[in-house]
Amino acid sequence: MKTKQVASVVSLALSLFLVTGCAQLDHKANVNSKETVKQTKVTYSDEQLRSNENTLSVLWYQRAAEAKALYLQGYQLATDRLKNQLGQATEKPYSIVLDIDETVLDNSPYQAKNILEGTSFTPESWDVWVQKKEAKPVAGAKEFLQFADQNGVQIYYISDRAASQVDATMENLKKEGIPVQGRDHLLFLEEGVKSKEGRRQKVKETTNLIMLFGDNLVDFADFSKKSEEERTVLLSELQEEFGRQFIIFPNPMYGSWESGVYKGDKLDASHQLKERRKALESFEK
């Protein structure tokens, strides 16, 4: 009997030891796991954080049917207006002027790459993308431009792409079925010339310019280097032109409007992030 009692006591003690030991091991495992999580915590630079802020904008531009619908709406409206205009006599040939980026060609893959790599725009990385000649047309652009071309309308592309990128851009456009009526119909950024207004006036010298297309207010008038207040005033003066002579498209990814948030100052990533938050309009609880 005593032997059985001793055996029972030993068995119970051993069980308690094993349970306690397992609990301690589990506790140590949890502690080690938490320490591992702490050790693998990722820290982002200000430039990476700034780049990441563009994620939802790029996703909307690439994935949202609403984005495509806005392009279709703009180009269908332009087609109807052009049909009406073609029935009217003109001394000079009709012409239209279009920006290229996010107006005719979709460059959102370049923006996406910057997000994934935690980088931002540089002339060098942008040129790599342009030289690949892989940008696709935005919804409705090809059909509208082919219609305009077939009806004798002069098509000019006024872009702030570098003059050295004309050949690659022409190849990209032609590959996607976008009409290019000659090298002289691509008016790109020349050294020392920032505003697009002079290039628009050049088109007006020999043609009857009837419509302008773009994703940025500088594609329609001289909105460059203006404060938010000045841009608002100029917009109110031109508001009757939108949906008529001016066709504007959505671009939440970048644009000249952003400089208004920074008051025209050239800020580093850290200060840009701060100014963005300060510019938000919220409400009191």
Can you say where each PLM-predicted feature lies in the sequence?
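Active-site neighborhood of HAD-like aspartate-dependent phosphohydrolases
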Residues: Q88, P93, V104-A135, Q150
